Amino acid sequence: MSRPPRLTASDFDPEVLDLFDRYVHGQIDRRGFLSGAAGLLAALTPQFAAAQQVKPDDARLKTSFVEFASPDGYGKARGYLVRPAKARRLLPAVLVIHENRGLNPHIEDIARRLGLAGYIAFAPDALFPLGGYPGDEDAARALFQKLDATKTRQDILAAARMLRTLEGGNGRLGAVGFCWGGGMTNFVATQVPELLAAAPFYGAAPPAEDVAKIRAELLVVLADNDERINAGWPAYEAALKAAGTHYTTFRPPGTQHGFNNDTTPRYDERAAHDAWSRLLALFERTLRKGHRASPG
């Protein structure tokens, strides 16, 4: 029987190590240690209400939950649709792909932020076939493990196709995704040649053999301290260069995986602000004006 890998200090948050040190040196007892650990866990729990930037009933927006067909996926899928309330012209659309928690309040807020920026935003819920986002992050994480990955990918592609022909849209399509959604954004870029722009935030790279299929311009956002995702970046970048894909990268120093998520302690305000500004600049140029940059 093999031994589990030995963990080192770098595997733990400094606050956890400080708490453990105080326990080892008798400054707190076991009960105090467990109580403190529980407090840390509570502190790490997403604070959706506190981080909300755009209220669900903001009068400047029209929001609704929309079901759509996904014949190659689970058959039927559902997502959160946001559009400016008083649009005077046809608008570009943005597919918003959530983390591995489903369509939680944070991702709905991201969609509303894009709505206020003048886009039609649509955030599909990968967990819809299993009842949808359950309202609890731990339960959502557990549900994610039960999804059929092939069907889920097809649901996301069906959402992209639906957006291209949505009433009120001008046919121009972009995508942004975070964590699991970042990897899914990379996948969508390899499968939807009509996609004009994509911004995968700390997402897994697509298979190298599929990179040449990408026609969208990419903004690849990486966290500085993200060993798992960053390990795949050199090969992904080499494939992008070989294919002549238009791309830029943004890797703000000192950031953690999930730094854009303003509901958790991993949030880095300055880095998130800069990443969002770059995202909006990409969409403004490619989706609204139809311009492309030079290859990366």
Regions found by a protein language model. Name each.
Residues D18-L44:
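N-terminal secretory signal peptides and thylakoid transit peptides that target proteins
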Residues M1-I28:
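N-terminal secretory signal peptides
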Residues A158-R215:
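Primarily recognizes the serine-hydrolase "nucleophile elbow" in alpha/beta-hydrolase
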Residues L90-H98:
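Short beta-strand element of the alpha/beta-hydrolase
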Residues L127-T150, G258-T263:
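Cap/lid segment of the alpha/beta-hydrolase catalytic domain
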Residues Q52-K86:
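N-terminal cap/lid segment of alpha/beta-hydrolase-fold proteins
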